[in-house]
Amino acid sequence: MNAAPADQIRLLDVQDLDVRLQQLAHKRRSLPEHAEIESLTKDATQLRDLLVAAQTEESDTAREQTKAEQDVDQVRQRAARDQQRLDSGAATSPKDLENLQREITSLAKRQGDLEDIVLEVMERLESAQERVAELTERVASVQSKIEDATARRDAALESLDGEIASVTKEREVISATVPADLLKLYDKLRAQQGGIGAAKLYQRTCQGCRQELAITDINEIRAAAPDTVVRCENCRRILVRTSESGL
């Protein structure tokens, strides 16, 4: 393959731009905000799970308190009715009077026990409510951090995308001046060789694989016409000759 020396030099410009695009793409993928958002999102998910559990406990305990208070009210109402019967003299026989007094005493103890249960449930409900409030605040805090990190990530991506668009446009302009067959070979080699399809020959060393060429290869390149497209015998990349090639 033949190409004018100037076209081969421009191929190095295309290569430089492709390297820059690779660097920008890597930087885009490696923004610290990506890992930060991922970590915060995991934290938020765990906290939301804890919050749901705490809210469930809160609602269950609230229902338990309502039931305990209803039990107290029922016992209190029954005791009030018995006391009213006692006060009204409705219990006329000694046995009825004794039974009524015994039931009033039993209900008073039952009411006391139930009121203790209500107090215990109220304490658990208060604790559950505090837990819900704490977790709600923590979820909001983490969500705020996620939003902040997302805003920073989006701003960084916007800046990088702008630079990528600019470099891509510049590559299009320069690559349009490179012969199609040379550019096709370059793109093929670039895909095969980790993003580097053309390299400068500097002081008899290929800048693609960093290997110094054998003297026989140097002699062949020295003897080749200026418009001959030469390849590195080590890595097979396109070698571009310049005044610094050491030929």
Where are these regions (language model features)?
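Short linker/helix segments within small regulatory modules
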Residues: I221-V229
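Short Cys/His-rich local motifs and their 1-3 flanking residues in nucleic-acid-associated proteins
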Residues: Q211, N234-R237
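Amphipathic alpha-helical coiled-coil segments
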Residues: A54-Q65, L107-L125, I174-S175
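Short cysteine-rich clusters marking metal-coordination/redox-active sites
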Residues: C206, C232-C235
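Short, non-ligating residues that shape and space the ligands of small metal-coordination modules
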Residues: I215-T216, R241-T242
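Coiled-coil termination/hinge junctions
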Residues: I146-G208
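Long amphipathic alpha-helical coiled-coil segments
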Residues: K67-A79, L114-V139
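Short, charge-rich amphipathic alpha-helices with coiled-coil/heptad character
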Residues: M1-P5, V19-D60, R85, A91, ...
